[in-house]
Amino acid sequence: MSWQTYVDDHLCCEIDGQHLTSAAILGHDGSVWTESPNFPKFKPEEIAGIVKDFEEPGHLAPTGLFLGGTKYMVIQGEPGVVIRGKKGTGGITIKKTGMALILGIYDEPMTPGQCNLVVERLGDYLIDQGY
Protein backbone atom coordinates (compact mmCIF):
# COMPACT_ATOMS: atom_id res chain seq x y z
CA MET A 1 0.00 0.00 0.00
CA SER A 2 1.34 3.45 -0.87
CA TRP A 3 1.62 6.23 1.70
CA GLN A 4 -0.92 8.24 -0.32
CA THR A 5 -3.49 5.53 0.35
CA TYR A 6 -3.10 6.15 4.09
CA VAL A 7 -3.99 9.83 3.62
CA ASP A 8 -6.78 9.21 1.11
CA ASP A 9 -8.44 6.19 2.74
CA HIS A 10 -7.57 6.51 6.44
CA LEU A 11 -7.12 10.22 7.22
CA CYS A 12 -9.39 11.96 4.71
CA CYS A 13 -12.08 9.29 4.94
CA GLU A 14 -15.65 10.15 5.92
CA ILE A 15 -16.42 10.13 9.64
CA ASP A 16 -20.11 10.64 10.47
CA GLY A 17 -20.46 12.58 7.22
CA GLN A 18 -17.41 14.79 7.89
CA HIS A 19 -13.85 14.90 6.54
CA LEU A 20 -10.54 16.42 7.61
CA THR A 21 -9.79 19.56 5.61
CA SER A 22 -6.21 18.34 5.05
CA ALA A 23 -3.77 15.73 6.28
CA ALA A 24 -0.17 14.59 5.90
CA ILE A 25 2.38 12.05 7.01
CA LEU A 26 5.85 13.52 7.53
CA GLY A 27 9.18 12.17 8.67
CA HIS A 28 10.57 13.54 11.95
CA ASP A 29 12.98 15.57 9.78
CA GLY A 30 10.06 17.29 8.05
CA SER A 31 10.31 15.26 4.85
CA VAL A 32 6.91 14.76 3.23
CA TRP A 33 5.96 11.09 2.95
CA THR A 34 2.52 12.02 1.61
CA GLU A 35 -0.02 14.80 1.94
CA SER A 36 -3.46 15.81 0.78
CA PRO A 37 -3.48 18.29 -2.12
CA ASN A 38 -4.51 21.22 0.08
CA PHE A 39 -2.13 20.57 2.99
CA PRO A 40 -0.52 23.89 4.00
CA LYS A 41 2.99 24.65 2.79
CA PHE A 42 5.03 24.64 5.98
CA LYS A 43 8.48 25.90 6.95
CA PRO A 44 11.17 23.53 8.28
CA GLU A 45 11.34 25.50 11.53
CA GLU A 46 7.61 24.89 12.11
CA ILE A 47 8.19 21.12 11.99
CA ALA A 48 11.31 21.49 14.15
CA GLY A 49 9.17 23.26 16.77
CA ILE A 50 6.60 20.47 16.70
CA VAL A 51 9.29 17.79 17.08
CA LYS A 52 10.84 19.76 19.97
CA ASP A 53 7.46 19.84 21.74
CA PHE A 54 7.32 16.05 21.54
CA GLU A 55 10.81 15.92 23.08
CA GLU A 56 10.13 18.71 25.59
CA PRO A 57 6.37 18.76 26.26
CA GLY A 58 5.10 22.29 26.81
CA HIS A 59 7.67 23.91 24.51
CA LEU A 60 4.97 25.28 22.16
CA ALA A 61 2.47 26.31 24.85
CA PRO A 62 3.79 29.88 25.35
CA THR A 63 4.08 30.75 21.64
CA GLY A 64 1.54 28.48 19.99
CA LEU A 65 1.94 25.89 17.27
CA PHE A 66 2.59 27.24 13.78
CA LEU A 67 1.97 25.29 10.58
CA GLY A 68 1.88 26.92 7.17
CA GLY A 69 1.92 30.31 8.86
CA THR A 70 -1.26 29.55 10.81
CA LYS A 71 -1.06 29.81 14.59
CA TYR A 72 -2.87 27.24 16.71
CA MET A 73 -3.32 27.52 20.47
CA VAL A 74 -1.89 24.34 22.01
CA ILE A 75 -4.50 22.50 24.07
CA GLN A 76 -4.42 19.35 26.16
CA GLY A 77 -2.66 16.47 24.46
CA GLU A 78 -0.59 13.49 25.54
CA PRO A 79 2.98 14.61 26.38
CA GLY A 80 5.45 13.10 23.94
CA VAL A 81 2.71 11.32 21.98
CA VAL A 82 -0.04 13.69 20.75
CA ILE A 83 -0.18 17.46 20.25
CA ARG A 84 -3.54 19.14 19.79
CA GLY A 85 -4.14 22.70 18.65
CA LYS A 86 -7.17 24.93 18.23
CA LYS A 87 -7.86 27.90 15.98
CA GLY A 88 -11.34 29.37 15.78
CA THR A 89 -13.80 26.67 14.74
CA GLY A 90 -11.07 24.24 13.71
CA GLY A 91 -7.80 22.79 14.82
CA ILE A 92 -5.05 20.25 14.37
CA THR A 93 -4.05 16.89 15.84
CA ILE A 94 -0.51 15.53 15.49
CA LYS A 95 0.42 11.98 16.49
CA LYS A 96 4.09 10.98 16.75
CA THR A 97 5.15 7.46 15.82
CA GLY A 98 8.66 6.01 15.92
CA MET A 99 9.46 7.39 12.46
CA ALA A 100 6.63 9.72 11.43
CA LEU A 101 4.29 12.56 12.32
CA ILE A 102 0.63 12.08 11.40
CA LEU A 103 -1.11 15.45 10.97
CA GLY A 104 -4.81 16.11 10.58
CA ILE A 105 -6.40 19.55 10.20
CA TYR A 106 -10.15 20.04 10.63
CA ASP A 107 -12.82 22.71 10.66
CA GLU A 108 -16.48 22.68 11.66
CA PRO A 109 -18.69 20.79 11.36
CA MET A 110 -16.05 18.12 12.11
CA THR A 111 -15.37 17.95 15.84
CA PRO A 112 -12.00 17.83 17.63
CA GLY A 113 -12.89 14.33 18.86
CA GLN A 114 -13.47 13.07 15.32
CA CYS A 115 -10.11 14.48 14.19
CA ASN A 116 -8.35 12.95 17.20
CA LEU A 117 -9.92 9.56 16.48
CA VAL A 118 -8.84 9.48 12.83
CA VAL A 119 -5.28 10.73 13.40
CA GLU A 120 -4.54 8.72 16.52
CA ARG A 121 -6.02 5.50 15.14
CA LEU A 122 -3.73 5.65 12.09
CA GLY A 123 -0.77 6.59 14.29
CA ASP A 124 -1.37 3.60 16.55
CA TYR A 125 -1.64 1.32 13.52
CA LEU A 126 1.66 2.61 12.08
CA ILE A 127 3.36 2.14 15.45
CA ASP A 128 2.14 -1.48 15.47
CA GLN A 129 3.62 -1.87 11.96
CA GLY A 130 7.05 -0.63 13.09
CA TYR A 131 6.79 2.94 11.83
From Swiss-Prot:
One of its GO terms (cellular component) is cytoskeleton. Keywords: Actin-binding, Cytoplasm, Cytoskeleton. It comes from the Eukaryota. GO terms for molecular function: actin monomer binding. It is found in: Cytoplasm, Cytoskeleton. Its main location: cytoplasm. SMART domains: PROF. Occurs in many kinds of cells as a complex with monomeric actin in a 1:1 ratio. Binds to actin and affects the structure of the cytoskeleton. At high concentrations, profilin prevents the polymerization of actin, whereas it enhances it at low concentrations. By binding to PIP2, it inhibits the formation of IP3 and DG. This is Profilin-1. It comes from Triticum aestivum (Wheat). The gene is PRO1.
